[in-house]
């Protein structure tokens, strides 16, 4: 069930897991993609070596619920990344979309001391309001999320943390959104990936009576995007003057080349 796609000449996405058993109230993925399943570690290693032979230097590990890797085989996500860290053929790995309740302290500590896993996390929050998280049927409360961010920043101060957030979920009252906004604004994260809530037939969210008007949903998206822009600016500014390793990926017509630092700062060199 492995698949990979090339994002750039030096980087590719490797899908190590598919499907989901979580049944969040707004989401149809468990119905569309089936139950959670993943490849064996030995097959992931083989796929990584295969893409390395094509000149790929960086792999982003992806999945619907990446941290759920191996649950049906007895292997674990931590087992996987420990094994991949020994793979000489690939310079860099990144972890994409790992649920906060599956982002263990052991995983964070491993990345902090890893040779090949970059100081870069992508963790879905979805809402900064516990009331809305309950309506979403998420498996954590915001306090757990804040603890994970704090753990990352304590062990890896320069880590880039990207966060998924949904705006305008059914049941997200003005008070709940303001509560979420304040919580998110106070998080020491680097960027928000903001999505407007959209209705999905067959989901439990449709049973929630309070509907956010479309114009208000749009306003909330923009409010969160403004927070994201400020956070990304602050993260970049904090690193001005530093020297960090860069994997260059492309060149433009003018001859400049671009790439990303280990902690996911975009740079261009003339």
Language model features: what each stretch is:
Residues 123, 164, 184, 192, ...:
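Hydrophobic, well-ordered secondary-structure elements that form the walls
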């Amino acid at each position: 069930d492995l698949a990979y796609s090339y994002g750039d000449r030096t980087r590719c996405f490797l899908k190590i897991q598919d499907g989901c058993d979580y049944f969040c109230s707004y989401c149809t993925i468990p119905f569309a993609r089936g139950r959670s399943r993943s490849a064996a570690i030995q097959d992931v290693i083989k796929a990584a070596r295969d893409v390395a032979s094509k000149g790929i230097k960086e792999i982003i590990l992806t999945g619907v619920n990446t941290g759920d890797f191996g649950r049906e085989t007895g292997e674990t996500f931590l087992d996987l990344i420990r094994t991949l860290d020994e793979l000489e053929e690939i310079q860099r790995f990144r972890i994409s979309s790992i649920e906060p309740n599956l982002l263990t302290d052991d995983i964070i500590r491993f990345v902090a001391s890893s040779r090949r896993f970059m100081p870069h996390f992508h963790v879905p929050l979805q809402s900064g309001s516990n009331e809305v998280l309950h309506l979403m049927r998420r498996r954590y409360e915001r306090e757990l999320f804040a603890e994970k961010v704090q753990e990352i920043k304590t062990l890896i101060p320069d880590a880039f943390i990207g966060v998924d957030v949904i705006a305008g979920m059914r049941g997200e009252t003005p008070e709940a959104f303001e509560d979420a906004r304040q919580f998110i604004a106070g998080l020491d994260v680097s960027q928000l990936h903001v999505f407007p809530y959209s209705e999905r037939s067959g989901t439990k969210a449709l049973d929630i009576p309070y509907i956010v008007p479309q114009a208000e949903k749009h306003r909330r998206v923009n409010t969160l995007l403004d927070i994201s822009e400020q956070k990304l600016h602050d993260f970049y500014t904090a690193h001005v003057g530093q020297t960090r390793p860069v994997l260059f990926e492309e060149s433009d017509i003018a001859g400049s080349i671009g790439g990303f630092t280990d902690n996911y700062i975009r740079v261009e060199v003339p």
